[in-house]
Every structure is written in C-alpha cells, then in structure tokens.
Amino acid sequence: MSSNVISLFPAKQVVNRSRLVLLPVIGLLIFLAMWHLAAREVQTSLGTLPGPVQTFQQFSNLVDDHWQEREKEQAFIERQEKRNAAKLTKNPDAAVKIRPYTGKPTFFDQIITSLVTVTAGFLLATVIAIPLGIVLGLNQGLYQAFNPIIQLLKPVSPLAWLPIVTMVVSATYVSDDPMFAKSFINSLITVALCSLWPTLINTAVGVTSVDKDLINVSKVLQLSWWQHIRTIVLPSAIPMIFTGLRLSLGIAWMVLIAAEMLAQNPGLGKFVWDEFQNGSSASLGRIMVAVITIGFIGLLLDRGMLQLQKWLSWNKQQALR
C-alpha cells in the first residue's frame, strides 16, 4: 500500500509541472485568438487594427531596420578610418577627427535607452525612499508630520510633474558640454518622483512593524543606532521593503513611457509617439509591437525583482506573491 502511494508522487509532480507550463500556453493561445478575431472588426483611419500576424511582420521589419542601421554605422566607421589613414599617410602630424555616428536610433536602441532611464530613475527613488522610510518608521512623530505630505504627492501624475521638472532642469542644468541630455534628466527625475512612494511607505510600515521583543533585545544589548538598524530593523523590514520596491519598479516603468513621450527622451515612449505622429500604414503595427514589448519588459522586471526578493528575504511566503 505504501509503495503504491509513494509511486504516485512522481506522477503527481509531472502533472503539477505540466499544469505550470500548459495553462499559461493555453491562456496565451486564447488571447491570440481573441485578438485576431477582434482586430478584424476594428477599422481605424489607418486601416484595420493589426492582429498578431501583422504585428509579428512589423517586428520582423524593425529587426531588419536595426541591422541595416548597424551596417550603415559600420560603413561610416570604415570610411572615416580610411580617410584618416590617408590623411596621416600624407602628413603624419596631421590632426584627425573622429566623429561619432549620428544615425537615427533603432527600435532596439530605444529599448536600451528606456531600460537605462528606468534603472537610473528607480535607483534614485530607492536611494531616497529607503533611508527616509527608515527615519520616518523609527520616529512616530515625524511619520505623523510627513504622512499628509506623502499622501498629497503620491497620486500626482507624471504629466503634471514633467513640466515642473523640465523648467527646473532647464534653469539649473546649464552646461556647454553636458554629460547627459536634458531629456534623459527630465525623464529620470520624473520617474523617481512618481515611483518612490510605495518604497517609502512600505519601508516606514516595515520599520514600525518590527517585533517589540527584538527591540527589547536591542536595548538589553545596548546596540548603537547603526547596529540597531543593521541587525534588527533592516532584516525585519526586508519583506515589506521588497514589496515596495516591486511596486515602485512597476510604477517607474509605466511612468517612463509617458514621460518619454513628452520629454522626447529617445526611448520606447518617443517611439510610440513618433509612430502615432507618422500615421503611416505600418504605424499601428509598430505601436502594437511597442505595446507588447513594454508589457513583456515590465513582466521581466517584476519577475527579476521577485527572484531578488526570494534570494534576500527571510519571508519566502511573501516572496511568492
């Protein structure tokens, strides 16, 4: 009897693993079928709404455009090297100029730009939110004083922040040879302003929720302020902090696309806006490619943060959510 029960476990594991694979695949197929059927019924000023097949074709075209642009870049570099070599042959002391390639960014270049921008904005938000959240969590008076301000600023849209950020950056970030483009700085700061609140709030709540027994142990051991933070507060608050970080990263990615549309930072948001303004027959398909890419990258960012939470958090159950 026991041997029969034991023999069932491998079969049960196979069934469970099959469900993990098959159910998402079935859901994806249903989604594609519904998209295909619905797209044929929607007529726009640019034609029929693109379905999965047309969207994939536009993705293939974007891949081809990327490689064509890389070939142009390589040809430009080779011509420049030949020209400089010929110039140095005639005059070894001649000054040669190395000009960067200034071709248009491809779809994949814009993906990289968006990833760099959202990473910088998210890191800035994290650097501000976690220390401030710890301070507010440790001091109930400060938390009560600043909580109304936090609740006031938390729901402000990036479309409201961006004009203010743009004016401030234009007035303060003045340089003849800037290290970063103003559009990048505008997008970065807007992302940080909109995404820091979940991490700030969850960090403060996590700190205030530290077990009283652990706080008493810290007092008995006469730990210094920094030792108390490092050995008691942070380990206890880690699950809540990571919950805030996951929420902040999702908001950062969502906000970035809107910010790039207005700030004209050459990322995915600008790609969508340019295609919308272009209004060609291929524009709708390319916008659909961008929409799916934005969603897919957002999913990867969330899964990556979830995996990091599993590695660093002691609360494995919360890391599964």
Where are these regions (language model features)?
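Transmembrane-helix boundary motif in ABC transporter permease subunits
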Residues: A120-I150
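C-terminal transmembrane helix and the adjacent membrane-cytosol boundary/short C-terminal tail
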Residues: M288-R321
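Short cytoplasmic-facing helical segments at TM-TM junctions of multi-pass membrane proteins
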Residues: P198-G244
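Alpha-helical membrane-protein architecture signal
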Residues: F56, P100, K104, F108, ...
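N-terminal signal-anchor/first transmembrane alpha helix
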Residues: S7-E41
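Periplasmic/extracellular loop-to-transmembrane helix junction in inner-membrane transport proteins
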Residues: E41-F122
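Generic hydrophobic transmembrane alpha-helix motif, especially the helices
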Residues: G137, N147, Q151-P198, V205-G206
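Transmembrane alpha-helices
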Residues: W225-A259, V289, M305
